[in-house]
Amino acid sequence: MKFIDWIKPGIKLKRWIMLGGMGVLFISFALAELITKGSYYNVYYKAFYIFLIVVGAFILYISLTQGMKSIISLINKGYLNVSLDSRKLGNLIYEKRLLVKGPKIVAIGGGTGLSTMLRGLKYYTSNITAVVTVADDGGGSGALREDLGILPPGDIRNCILALSDTEPLMEDLLQYRFKDGRLKNQSFGNLFLAAMDGISTNFEEAVHKMSSVLAVTGKVLPVTLDNVVLKAKLKNGVVVEGESNIPEQAILYESPIEKIFIEPENARALHETVQAIKEADAVILGPGSLFTSVIPNLLVKDIGNALLKTKALKLYVSNIMTQPGETDNFSVSDHVNAITKHVGGKVVDYTLVNNGTVSEKLKKKYFEKTSELVKIDKNELDKIGVGIVEGNFIKIKDGFVRHDSDEIAKILVETIMDKKLFYDRKKIIEYFYLSQRLKENRKLEKENRGN
């Protein structure tokens, strides 16, 4: 490892290196004097130089022990695991030290979109708090919710895995779904979290324990510990109950969603979540189903108020495609207006929108399911005072349009740097570190494309 790597700002070793150098200087000077001129000195001079050697040795001891403590503290806190890969120790320390000091980001949502985004963000900061919806009542999560009375674990499991630092085999195991018997279509990860809930005092503790086992970067929190039920009032006046039923009934009645609400309406947010929003550099809403994954979180008591009061940069990641039964014919401004309406005030400063396109074949496939690319209506967004950040976020996976986790993370980090960190002098080290990291990732991308 190069010497320059040890003296980079933020690694907290430079001070001990300098102190150690001072100790070596004291010892060297005293020894040189005693060896070359010792016979000419009386006992008092000799005692002085011996004293210098003792002081130098003490200083050297302090510098070595404190320097090692600085390294070991990273390992003990779980920020550094030298066995994870073959990168050099100094580079790992520098990277982990700055990730710990990276921008404080709160990501609010649920479903596949949120976990996809988290996979990209964890490479830029470890100060991530993922706030996840607990209104899911379908699939394996719904079955466990009904049978065991626990909060739905599916979305939380996906976010934990997205932020975890585990072997691929462990991730495959936790994502495995049983194919037969009474557990058919049930995820092992859901069962793992349900078992963890059984040995914990509450669901929040169970999530913390699972996060600890899987070495999660940041935190994953349920938006509330209350057993909430999601309801929707359609424009025709019909009230639909259940997250999984809402889009289906909207399609059946051919009536769009007018309003979303939760019961109990006084469900309380975790104090830790509210505090994270208050202290955040940026709060990200989405991506995810607007009415069933994003907005339900904002209806929980204290979350909406915290968003209105926070000084954090507030970003909304718009969906790429409209969703049948939820956002039919919606433009980007329609998404933002729906959020504003339900919170009761403006909570979006900038919205990230996709300007990429898909093949005609894929457009036709989605059109047959009454879905299309979300329209970017810049004029309407200007009218409501919401900035636009554009990028090509499309990634085709298994024939479906998905967000590209790496690309969306880069754009988000660049936006946070330019709109928030650039004006905060205390974050200057993180700003330059993130700039360097982004450049490295861009360079790596070009090399991969060239190959």
From Swiss-Prot:
Keyword check for Cytoplasm: yes
Entry's Gene Ontology BP terms: regulation of cell shape
Domain of life: Bacteria
InterPro entries hit by this protein: CofD, CofD-like_dom_sf, Gluconeogen_factor
Subcellular location: Cytoplasm
Keyword Glycosyltransferase: no
Chief place where the protein resides: cytoplasm
Matches recorded under SUPFAM superfamilies: CofD-like (SSF142338)
Listed GO CC annotations: cytoplasm
Keywords: Cytoplasm
One of the record's GO molecular function terms: LPPG:FO 2-phospho-L-lactate transferase activity
Family: Belongs to the gluconeogenesis factor family.
PANTHER family per the UniProt record, alphabetical: GLUCONEOGENESIS FACTOR-RELATED, UNCHARACTERIZED PROTEIN YVCK-RELATED
Role, per record: Required for morphogenesis under gluconeogenic growth conditions.
Protein name: Putative gluconeogenesis factor
Species name: Clostridium acetobutylicum (strain ATCC 824 / DSM 792 / JCM 1419 / IAM 19013 / LMG 5710 / NBRC 13948 / NRRL B-527 / VKM B-1787 / 2291 / W)
Lineage: Bacteria, Bacillati, Bacillota, Clostridia, Eubacteriales
